[in-house]
């Protein structure tokens, strides 16, 4: 048995994509296999037309291979039961608008999507059974666009059934008068137990994404080399994650100066002693780090080390670095593996 217990089934591949930007969860800016799995389970168990569920934390994922209870708990940590309730098209759209309030409004020049810090991960629901767009150029309450049900525009007076957990039903949909209907069915077991049963029946489970929703109304300047440079600084830990407020290209010069100033202050610990690490610099839109200080610090020690770059370097004698050769532009003839 692994750390999370006995195997409950297996997957054919990882379910969550890599984050493009450190600390900006891919699962909150695009449809993913994790959310489609949860909503599929809810739809199958409830018989509802539409399902809504949240990614309770941005790092929730299912790895490739055997799946245990710890993995299931990671993607669904609360002991919720499932309700089926009647809603109108207008009520469903109002619910979707409530959920989309978690995003900040996009401004011209923003390089990333950011989030209102007042809305934790578990308050952002994603929907299955309908196709829709979220226009982040619009203010809160005006973002849900082009809602389609079975290939046709969803009408405000259209009657639907919705699968939703008991907590969301009571704490939001009813407490905030988003819907008028009451539950017509409640599960006898938890949603987490339903996911366990799904793996028992369907393993190996492949990560499938239907891409039924997307964010529109934004231009993240993905072809602009300035954006690539800033993203490199964020991912290297030289700029803070722009989670609650997007970085904007209008602030490019000051952000670069901030990143380079932080690079000057970084240190590396070698056998318990702090050493200066050399500065970051740029070449053709890529961010590189001079490791000559590190090489000199280790020279003659025979130390092997792990490198985890998040704005710092951790060095521990006896732990081998298993990565690829570290490219050092301008001194390629001296670029060693340090292993």
What do the predicted segments below correspond to?
Residues 32, 36-260:
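Feature captures C-terminal
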